Amino acid sequence: KFYMTTAIAYTSGKPHIGNTYEIVLADAIARYKRLEGYDVYFQTGTDEHGQKIQEKAEKAGITPKEYVDNVAGEVKRIWDLMNTSYDNFVRTTDADHEKQVQKIFKKLYDQGDIYKGSYEGLYCTPCESFWTESQLVDGKCPDCGREVKPAKEEAYFFKMSKYADRLIEHINTHPEFIQPVSRKNEMMNNFLLPGLQDLCVSRTCLLYTSDAADD
């Protein structure tokens, strides 16, 4: 068995050359592995939730679902035009996908890996990222250089900190786990060793999203 997946294209706009570059490389790997005799399952798809999508749909005068339907259709058309050999194209608005997300969320919540708290920070809408004051560059988003706005909301968090020591030990004892070495060093030095932060896994201020919990 050989399972592979691409990153899923974000549907706030039409696919770009980076998306195309990735799907071509992934397709080449999938085809090569099939020639080697592997039973390959190759998956790709689209990410269809987020504030940028909500805002662009409002600007276009259509519903968010209509907006992502158009973009996802264009992504799939281009992938098919290039004869990519994916086995499954997943949209995050698919009913089956949403059910699985809710199932996993509930399981993690019930076992104490997800908890409710509040998130406060400086929010960059184009990047859909929260930042602290110390992370800003000249008072702006360190990724895109745009303005950020103060934001605070009730949210659910995944206890990544709970697994930090386990991850560090596994990476140290399995040096091939993250490749290339530069990415392993980046993960260790920038995230794990300074203290892994819990991850915010919900947004309460969006109208167009997938319901993860009853509230």
Predicted feature locations:
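N-terminal, positively charged nucleic-acid-binding surface of large information/translation enzymes
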Residues: K1-C205
